[in-house]
Amino acid sequence: MSQVTEQSVRFQTALASIKLIQASAVLDLTEDDFDFLTSNKVWIATDRSRARRCVEACVYGTLDFVGYPRFPAPVEFIAAVIAYYVHPVNIQTACLIMEGAEFTENIINGVERPVKAAELFAFTLRVRAGNTDVLTDAEENVRQKLRAEGVM
């Protein structure tokens, strides 16, 4: 697969991931954790476990909610979650915390090549750059869904 086509497929996978995120909004987060995840307060070293737990709650929310075991999420989905929920001031930290995931095509083909934080960060930036209309007001949209479901 050519480099351009591969990047296009990855981006389209990330777009599909954002649509899944918007449709489900099943998060295993308290209001405090959601505020922590989306706030402009810079995460420090002691926040690492909470930050990972919050990002993972967005990635695996539906599975956790119904009690199914987790399976590794692809980079495209993790990048979409980070782009959608994490405040820009903490995106680099979120990518560092979540490094080690695999791109979808590697999972499908059985190739092990975990991404480093820098690659996840670059891909997350690409997702944000291509989805400004989707990401605009995303936080408020999610808050409204959570309120409607009685979570907040």
Swiss-Prot record:
Q: Where is this gene product found?
A: Host cytoplasm
Q: Which GO terms describe its cellular component?
A: host cell cytoplasm
Transcription among the record's keywords?
Answer: no
Q: Which cysteines link up through disulfide bonds?
A: none
In terms of Pfam families, this protein maps to: gpD
Q: What is this protein called?
A: External scaffolding protein D
Q: Which family does it belong to?
A: Belongs to the microvirus D protein family.
Subunit structure of this entry?
Component of the procapsid particle composed of 60 copies of the internally located B, 240 copies of the external scaffolding protein D, 60 copies of each of the viral structural proteins F and G, and 12 copies of protein H.
- This chain's source organism reads Enterobacteria phage phiX174 (Isolate Sanger)
Name the keywords, alphabetized. Answer: Host cytoplasm, Viral capsid assembly, Viral release from host cell
What happens when you mutate G61D? Confers a lethal phenotype
Q: What does this protein do?
A: Assembles the procapsid by joining twelve 12S pre-assembly complex into a T=1 icosahedral particle, called 108S procapsid. Ten proteins D bind each 12S complex, which are formed by three pentamers of F, G, B protein and a H protein. The scaffolding protein is released from the provirion after genome packaging to form the mature virion.
Q: Does the keyword Oxidoreductase apply?
A: no
Q: Where does it mainly reside?
A: host cell
Choose any GO biological process term that the UniProt entry carries and state it: viral procapsid maturation
Q: Which Gene3D superfamilies match?
A: Scaffold protein D
